[in-house]
Amino acid sequence: MGFGNPYGDNYSEEIVFAWVNKLVSMGIQIISLADTVGVATAEQVYTMSKYLIDSLPSTEIGVHLHSRVDNWKKKLDAAVKAGCKRFDGALKGIGGCPMAKDELVGNMNTEWMINYFEENNFVTGINKEALEKSLQIAGEIFR
């Protein structure tokens, strides 16, 4: 959990940075900071992502964000402004973390993310036809 945890376990940005550096020293080239329980603030997303992107230019830094309807855009915007180019999402925002103390927290909705990227003129390369089919299938599976 890259941005904290609800368990009272030791957490600091320095601990995260130390583990990221250890993973990079082992040859890992892609790191996604996870906000598994949705506790990250937009400011945290920005500062941590920016620091890692700037200090590890050969490593691809991304985010796996969990959010509520009222804070997803702030978190996504913070990651984009920090320079992230890798983002995890879930169709229809399905899934989440049963350990999250906030029942409204879930995976960041892929459709919202795509709309955000398109509104901000980012080229996504998303196959819209395949996305629509995937959304239809997800709707049938997760009724």
Give the location of each predicted region.
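Catalytic cores and adjacent flexible loops of soluble metabolic enzymes
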Residues: 1-143
